[in-house]
Amino acid sequence: MEIFVKRLKELRKDKKLTQMQLSKATGLTASAISAWENNARVPSAIAIITLAKFFEVTADYLLGLSDI
């Protein structure tokens, strides 16, 4: 999950969003986003899809299965 953690942080920071702002924009909890970014929890499939749609990337990209 380290690739997911890295890519989530990069995508969020590229959009200049705080964890709270990302939470409000996606409907995901700020505590969950924090836990994912600290590699303390594994996101659900629904959360991964939600993040992928928000950032306009594929779930495969978020998970490190593709570089596009």
Protein language model regions, located:
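DNA major-groove recognition helix of helix-turn-helix/homeodomain DNA-binding modules
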Residues: 46-61
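Residues in the helix-turn-helix
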Residues: 32, 42, 61
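A short, Lys/Arg-rich alpha-helix, primarily the initiator
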Residues: 1-14
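Short alpha-helical DNA-recognition segment
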Residues: 16-35
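DNA major-groove recognition helix of helix-turn-helix
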Residues: 37, 47, 63-66
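Residue-level detection of the helix-turn-helix DNA-binding "recognition helix"
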Residues: 13, 27, 38-40, 67
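The alpha-helix within a helix-turn-helix
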Residues: 12, 23, 52
